[in-house]
Amino acid sequence: MTLVRLARQEDFDSVAALLVELGRPAVTDRETCLAVYTRDMEDPEAAHLLAEDDEGRVVGFCSLHFRPRLNQVSPQAYVPDLIVTEAARSKKVGHALLSEAENRARRRGCHHLTLESAHWRKDAHRFYLGFGLTDDGLAFGKALV
């Protein structure tokens, strides 16, 4: 059984390890990375969810941000990070995290839940479609630094 709870400041090392496992580009020094994590944890327009297995090991993380949209009265829920350890994939961890994110977004009055996924992450795409998300289009980006 997966326990989903709010992430805390002391979960930093576990969350950082998940980001590394996913291959996310990250700040290289721990002090700066911790400062970024702390800033994000203190954001009132965000929620950060952690998944633990039966033995209390961290097996997943989901960040959820509430963003205003000019064409909507209600905010949009955006998931910039949904990470499940490779060993815990296909064990309903991602489903538990995304379900909690959806529940929080609904309680917040959000009109839409969205996330982005790299085009090559085909297994993740199947999971998202199976969860009920739709392919709403493409995301474009440009590195600025």
Model-derived features: where do they sit?
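Acetyl-CoA-dependent GNAT
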Residues: L6-D13, A17-S74, P80, L98-S99, ...
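Residue-level recognition of the GNAT/N-acetyltransferase active site
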Residues: R67, T85, A118
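Short acidic/polar active-site loop segments enriched in Thr and Asp
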Residues: A47, H111, T134
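Extreme N-terminal starter segment of soluble prokaryotic enzymes
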Residues: M1-V4
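Conserved acetyl-CoA-binding loop-helix of GNAT-fold acetyltransferases
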Residues: V84, S90-N103, G130
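Conserved active-site alpha-helix within GNAT-family acetyltransferase domains
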Residues: H95, R107, H119-L138, K142
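Conserved GNAT acetyl-CoA-binding A-motif
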Residues: L98, A105-E116
